[in-house]
């Protein structure tokens, strides 16, 4: 955590949530995914962002440096929700932009709740488009072959 007179921000790295991400990004099988991380949560207090110039990129860079010091990091993947932003902070931290995630749909029951898992046969509801995410990757292991193409030139600013 970022602690300047109290916690100002948090950056959380997790293992990849599903093995298919590493398969799509690097062609890696389930048993080859050690050292791959997702920057899954990043939060900085808004008042801190307004008073401290470049605090978010500074903080993310320090967190990545610490993670690499404490464990083997081959690559970090992160996503920016296209409904809210396009990932300016990741570009500022030298992540490579790799386009949008695949289009997907989720099933919503008639009462408006989202279906999580299992069969929906015979259920009333509708399929809704899921928001696509901007994909960002930072590769440290030069032996990894990034299969997602670099799309930096096609991304407009926030």
Model-derived features with residue positions:
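Short, cationic low-complexity segments
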Residues: 148-158
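Conserved beta-hairpin
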Residues: 1-18
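Amide-forming acyltransferase catalytic core, primarily the GNAT-like/NAT-type
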Residues: 1-5, 130-133, 139
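C-terminal accessory regions of radical SAM enzymes
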Residues: 135-148
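Acyl-donor binding region in acyl/amide transferases
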Residues: 14-128, 135-138
